[in-house]
């Protein structure tokens, strides 16, 4: 890649072409990791591992966490998700086993109320991660999925 950047963005399909255009990126410029809501919700989960791989193995020296307005994760209701799982053949026994194993399934499935708060929470988790090197700017942005306007909610250069 021409730029040593890794981006975590939401998996919303509206961002596939819009985000690179808004950031003036060409194909191959950056590493992109996607998750529902651009959420990093576990310090040792797959999303965090991908960001660390980008930094250590792929030499990224800047991280952007980019959510978007009108995100579907703001409306995710864990009870509706659990009902849908039951309707699609996941048994109550399996759900009980997952809950019993120490995972609060409702909390794990829960969306967020406010995109700004969610992005800032993810930025802080990544910034304070014990394996993230100091001096790596962790930026938080929100994109308007209709216009491509980017709003900076955390300038990582000011919080090194």
What residue spans do the PLM features occupy?
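Short, conserved "active-site rim" segments that organize catalytic pockets and cofactor/ligand binding
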Residues: 1-48
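Short, surface-exposed, charge-dense and proline/glycine-enriched linear segments
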Residues: 19-31, 63-67, 92-102
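Divalent-metal-activated hydrolytic enzyme cores
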Residues: 1-3, 38-45, 53-61, 73-160
């Amino acid at each position: 890649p021409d730029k040593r950047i890794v981006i975590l963005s939401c998996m919303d399909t509206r961002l596939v072409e819009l985000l690179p255009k808004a950031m003036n990126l060409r194909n191959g410029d950056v590493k992109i990791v996607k998750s529902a809501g651009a959420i990093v919700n576990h310090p040792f989960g797959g999303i965090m591992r991908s960001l660390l791989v980008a930094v250590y193995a792929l030499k990224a020296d800047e991280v952007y966490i980019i959510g978007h307005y009108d995100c579907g994760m703001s409306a995710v209701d864990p009870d509706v998700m659990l009902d849908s799982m039951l309707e699609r053949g996941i048994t109550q026994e399996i759900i009980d086993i997952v809950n019993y194993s120490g995972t609060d399934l409702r909390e794990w499935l829960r969306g967020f109320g406010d995109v700004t708060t969610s992005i800032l929470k993810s930025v802080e988790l990544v910034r304070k991660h014990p394996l993230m090197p100091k001096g790596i700017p962790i930026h938080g942005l929100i994109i308007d999925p209709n216009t491509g306007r980017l709003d900076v909610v955390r300038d990582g250069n000011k919080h090194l």
